[in-house]
Amino acid sequence: MSTLHTVNKSPFERSAFISALNHLRPGDTLLMIEDAVVGARKGSAFAGLLENAVKTCSVYILGPDLAARGMGENDMIQGAKLVDYGGFVELVTSHDRTQAWL
């Protein structure tokens, strides 16, 4: 069973980001939204953890939230993919379950 893990809090403020990473299993998907997108910035304290995650899981970042924080695709770690709101819906419907990390 595939799981979509969504994280909306900055990894610099809450532990939900790390909890989600620790619960990822091969084939799962991580979707970073709202303030969580800052964790996907190249060179951030969390970049190495995410780069390891993309080896066995899919990592997506909500593009409008990234743009709202002054970042673009070139600011993201290697292997993460941008998704729009339609893509967000597609991710939810294509997984067996969704786990929201608050």
Language-model features and meaning:
Residues 3-17, 36-42:
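Short, glycine-rich nucleotide/cofactor-binding loops
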Residues 5-6, 32, 100-101:
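Redox-cofactor binding/interface segments in oxidoreductases and associated redox assembly factors
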Residues 25, 54-55:
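Short conserved AdoMet
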Residues 29-34, 57-65:
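Short internal beta-strands
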Residues 46-54:
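Catalytic-core regions built around general acid/base machinery
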Residues 69-102:
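C-terminal structural segments of small proteins and small subunits
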